């Protein structure tokens, strides 16, 4: 069986259209019988080991036609819209200037970043388990790890800050 948490390159439209099922104490999407998406903010009991899951991540390769200041205010500023009549011309320009081109609901989804509700659900799940788990499965990491691994080049986003809070409050069995 393959288990996974989502990251930032999943087709969230398709993933979130799947029925939600209970599995080993937490909510999942079953892609196939042996391919299972562990949803955000869930706790699973696998062979007596507790696993907290929290997927999601921000795409760091978005720039498009947005200015750096626009991207700092709203990282979605570099995303192209599929109904834009000039989309193919814009894509051509972006590709010739080595800019990453993403199209909403085609190659980029807003759902890549967790919502406040998902974050709250995760905190409530941990609280219900007395802030104890054996493992945390995530796609992204806490702010402190980002600083070390990113060499100071990456700025923490709300998910990194959330995972830092989880890291500080959680104890491991």
Question: Can you describe what each PLM-predicted range is?
Answer:
Residues 26, 49-154:
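Active-site-proximal loop/helix segment associated with metal-binding centers of metalloenzymes
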Residues 1-46, 156-157, 162-163, 168-169:
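Core catalytic region of metal-dependent phosphoesterases/phosphodiesterases
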Residues 8-14, 43-44, 59-63, 142-147, ...:
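Active-site environment of divalent metal-dependent phosphoester hydrolases
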């Amino acid at each position: 069986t393959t288990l996974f948490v989502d990251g930032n390159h999943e087709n969230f439209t398709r993933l979130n259209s799947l029925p939600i099922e209970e599995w080993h104490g937490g909510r999942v999407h079953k892609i196939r019988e042996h391919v299972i998406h562990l949803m955000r903010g869930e706790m699973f009991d696998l062979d007596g080991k507790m696993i907290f899951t929290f997927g999601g991540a921000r795409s760091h390769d978005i720039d498009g036609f947005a200015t750096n200041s626009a991207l700092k205010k709203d990282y979605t500023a570099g995303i192209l819209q599929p109904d834009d009549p000039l989309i193919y011309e814009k894509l051509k320009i972006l590709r010739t200037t080595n800019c990453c081109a993403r199209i909403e609901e085609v190659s980029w989804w807003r759902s890549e970043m967790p919502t406040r509700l998902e974050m709250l659900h995760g905190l409530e799940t941990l609280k219900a388990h007395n802030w104890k788990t054996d493992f945390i499965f995530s796609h992204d990491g806490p702010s402190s790890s980002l600083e070390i691994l990113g060499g100071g080049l990456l700025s923490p986003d709300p998910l990194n800050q959330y995972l830092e809070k989880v890291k500080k409050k959680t104890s491991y069995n």
